[in-house]
Amino acid sequence: MSFTRRHAIAAGVIGGVAVAAEPGKLSAQAAQKTFVLVHGAWHGGWCWRTVADLLEKQGHKVFAPTLTGLGERSHLIGPDVNVTTHIVDIENVIKWENLSDVVLVGHSYGGLVISGVAERVSDKISSIIFLDAFLPEDGDSLLEKSSPAFKAAIEAAIARKDISFKAPPAAAFGVAEKDQAWVNSKTTPQPIGTYAEKATYKGGRDKIARKAFIRAKGYASPTFDANVAKVKSNSGWKLVELETGHDVMVIAPDKLAALLIDLA
């Protein structure tokens, strides 16, 4: 599996959040963490570029893998690529890189993926963060959690035996006009098998000590709003609401990097 690994040591300020450290040294507050950042549908590890750079500059280790069939791995797309494929992608990064005390972050569709990873290697994860993401229960699928119009479009694609589903324009994710051309040039069709698979979730994420949900309030999603209500009713979770569009890592990377450090 290909992935981006970043590792650097520095000190400073991210998004207005001060890190009290002498130049070239890390404070106890900024003790090194290991972040695994999982992108959402149609995206790739590329979308985390700025956030990863900011985390590195604070001395953290960052992995931003691209899931099978997407981004620079789009040549591997096929009808058999599904949520389980992507769960194994991330599990293998953790396994082959000998990672532990991982801060596992999943954006959007990535919430299904990191929930599955937590079923397999919860002992390797110290914090799990859902960034404007799906928060599945056992037997849920991406298709069932989609809007009626989107669900109908996916079902039609499945009936045609398509192997992928085209990405929406970047504007739909709330990306600023100046960044839309870049995002549009990088997004790739989502493997169709990721929509209908009913994955197994048996409470693995509940075993993780620190759990957080970040809601991008500028993105309309009844499903994500329901996740907010679910998290609010559970004292074991932290909830943060941001006034941004869906692609937070592109729209507000400074703010997100600081927030991830705080939630880690």
Predicted regions and their residues:
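N-terminal export signals
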Residues: 7-26
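C-terminal segment of N-terminal export signals and the immediately downstream linker at the start
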Residues: 20-38
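Conserved HGGG/HGGXW glycine-rich cap/lid loop of the alpha/beta-hydrolase fold
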Residues: 33-72
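Active-site loop/oxyanion-hole signature of alpha/beta-hydrolase fold enzymes
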Residues: 67-102, 119-120, 145-146
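Conserved hydrolase catalytic core segment
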Residues: 103-137
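Flexible "cap/lid" loop of the alpha/beta hydrolase fold
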Residues: 130-161, 165
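Conserved loop-alpha-helix segment in the C-terminal half of the alpha/beta-hydrolase fold
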Residues: 217-243, 250
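Catalytic active-site module of serine/aspartate enzymes centered on a nucleophile-bearing elbow/loop
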Residues: 240-264
